[in-house]
Amino acid sequence: MATLRRLQEAPRHLLVCEKSNFGHDKSRHKHLVETHYHNYRVSFLIPECGLLSKELKSLVMDIGPYYSVKNLPLHELITHEFINTFVKKGSFSALTYNTSIDEDNTVALLPNGKLILSLDKDTYEETGLQGRPSRYSGRKSMKFVISIDLMDLSLNLDSKKYRRISWSFKEKKPLKFDFLLAWHPTGTEESTMMSYFSKYQIQEHQPKVALSTVRELQCPVLRSSGLAGEPEEACSALEFFDWLGAVFCSADLNNEPYNFISTYCCPQPSAVVAQAFLCTITGFILPEKIHVLLEQLCHYFDEPKLAPWVTLTVQGFADSPVAWREKEHGFHKGGEHLYNFVVFNNQDYWLQMAVGANDDCPP
C-alpha cells in the first residue's frame, strides 16, 4: 500500500518568486541570467503590441550562431591550444546532445571553464579519475559526477594532475560525444569555430525564430508591488506563471463546456488586450545574448506604452548536467529548469525560477 501511495504522488516541483527593481544596486537579475548556462528556448510576450520595434527585431534576428560537432573526442576540450583560444578569450559553452542525463554519459563545459562529466558507474571507474556519486542515482550509486577546472589545469600543463587527465581521455578511456558549441569572445580577435574543428563533422546553425500575434488575449491584472496578489484587485505571481504557460502552449483560456482538452481559464481579475506579440527563439543560446535581450525589453518602456508589463521566459536543456551555476541537475519526470522575468513599466520586476524533482532550490 505504501508503494502504491508513493507511485501516485506527484514529483515535487519548486517555484521561487522574488521582486526587485532593475535600478537597485542589489538586484540579482544579471547574475541569475549569467549563471543559467545552457538555454534552448527564449520567449517574450508583449501585450498591446502588433509589431516589433526595429531594435528588438534586429536583436532577435542577430542572436548569434551555434554549432554542432559529431564524435568530438573529449580530450580536444582540455588541450592547451583549445583553452588558450576559446576558454581564456571569452565565454565558451559546450553540451552533449542526443543524450539522456538519467541514462547516458553526458558532458558540459561551462563558461567559467569548468568541465562537468556525468558518467555511469562503469565508465566512471574506467576513467580512473576522482569524482563523487550523483545526488540523484539512488541508494546504489550508478551515476558519478567529475568536475575539472580547465583554468586551473592550464596553469601547469606539466603537472601530474593534467597528465593523468590527458592520459585518461586519450588512452585509458577515450570518450567521444556529439556536442553543441557556442562562444562569445570578449576581445576583438575572433577565432572561428568552423576552422578550429574543421577535421570533425561540424555544422553552423542559426536559432529558429517564431513570431506570432495573439488576438483578443485575456491577461491577468498585476501589481508590481505584490507577488501574492490581492483579492479582486490583482493576480498572484503563481497564477500568472500558470497563465503564461497556458499561453505558450496555445491553450484555450475560456473554459468552455465543449472543450475537452483544457478546462483552464484566465485568473481573475483580468483584462482583454486587442493583441499581444509573442516571439520564441530556439537553439543553443548564450546567457550574454539573453542579458542583452532583457536590457532591450527594459528599454521598451522608455517611451509611453499601453502595455503595463512584458515577459521574458528562458528554458534550459532538460538533459544538461547542471541547472544554475554548478548545481547538479537531474531529469526524473521532466527535467525542467527555467526562469521568467515580468518586467513592469516602472522598472520593477518579478523573477520566477522553476525546477523539477531532481534539482536544488534555485539560487
UniProtKB/Swiss-Prot annotation:
Cellular component GO terms held in the UniProt record: multimeric ribonuclease P complex; nucleolar ribonuclease P complex
Record-level Gene Ontology MF annotations: ribonuclease P activity; ribonuclease P RNA binding
GO terms under biological process: rRNA processing; tRNA 5'-leader removal
Pfam families given in the database record: Ribonuc_P_40 (PF08584)
Keyword Metal-binding: no
Entries under InterPro entries matching the protein: RNase_P_Rpp40 (IPR013893)
Subcellular location per the Swiss-Prot or TrEMBL entry: Nucleus, Nucleolus
Key word tRNA processing present: yes
Keywords noted in UniProt: Nucleus, rRNA processing, tRNA processing
Functional note: Component of ribonuclease P, a ribonucleoprotein complex that generates mature tRNA molecules by cleaving their 5'-ends. Also a component of the MRP ribonuclease complex, which cleaves pre-rRNA sequences.
Assembly and interaction partners: Component of nuclear RNase P and RNase MRP ribonucleoproteins. RNase P consists of a catalytic RNA moiety and about 10 protein subunits; POP1, POP4, POP5, POP7, RPP14, RPP21, RPP25, RPP30, RPP38 and RPP40. Within the RNase P complex, POP1, POP7 and RPP25 form the 'finger' subcomplex, POP5, RPP14, RPP40 and homodimeric RPP30 form the 'palm' subcomplex, and RPP21, POP4 and RPP38 form the 'wrist' subcomplex. All subunits of the RNase P complex interact with the catalytic RNA. Several subunits of RNase P are also part of the RNase MRP complex.
PANTHER family membership: RIBONUCLEASE P PROTEIN SUBUNIT P40
Protein name: Ribonuclease P protein subunit p40
Lineage per the UniProt record: Eukaryota, Metazoa, Chordata, Craniata, Vertebrata
Gene it is expressed from: Rpp40
